[in-house]
Amino acid sequence: NIQTLRIVSILENRYYNFNGLNLTFETLDGLIKHNGPVINLTKFNKILGKNFFKNKIKFSNNTSLEAQIAAISDDIAYNSHDLEDGLKSNLFELNELRDIQVLNKIISKHKTRLKKYSIDLIVRQIIRDTINEMVKDVIKTTRKKIKINNIKSLKDVYMSKSQIVSFSDNMKKFDFQIKSFLKEKMYFHENVKVKTNYGRKIIK
C-alpha cells in the first residue's frame, strides 16, 4: 500500500505544478487504510513527509464503505484465484479441499456432475460458488453492522470502532482456513519456492 501511495502521490508526473495524480483525499484515505486504520505513521512520514496530507486524513479512523468493500473484495478474489490456480497447477487436488467444511459442502453439490462435465468446468463452478457464498455473507453481515452501529453518514463510518464491511464470524473462520491451506499447499510448495528464489536472483 505504501508503494502504491508513493506511485500515485510522487512518481506519476502528469501536471506542471505538482507530482502525482491529483487524487481526492477520500481516494487516498482508502489506499492508505486498505488493511484498516494506521497506527504507526513512521513509514508514511518517511516517504511523503509529515505535512503531506495537511491533516485531511485521520489515520486512526476507519475508511469509507467503498474502500472497505474494495479491501474485502481483494481477499475474496485472492482466495478464489489462488484456489483455482493451485488446482490447475496440480499443487493440490480437489479432494484435499474437502477438509474445509464450507468447501466440502460446495464440492459435494457437484459430485454427480463428474461423469458429465470436465474437471476444469466443475472447478470453475466450485470457485464461482465459493465466491458467491463469501459475497452473500459480506452483504448480510454488513447490513447487520450498519443497523447495529446506526450508520447514517460517512462520518459515522469513519468514527466506527470496527470495520463495517466484514465477514461473519463463521466466514472469518472459513477465510482463515483457506489462507492456511493455501499457505501450506501452495505458497510454501517446493516448486513455488524454487521459482520465487529464481525471481529474487533476477531482480537482484
Where do the protein language model's features map onto the residues?
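Histidine-centered, transition-metal-coordinating active-site segments
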Residues: 2, 7-16, 20-204
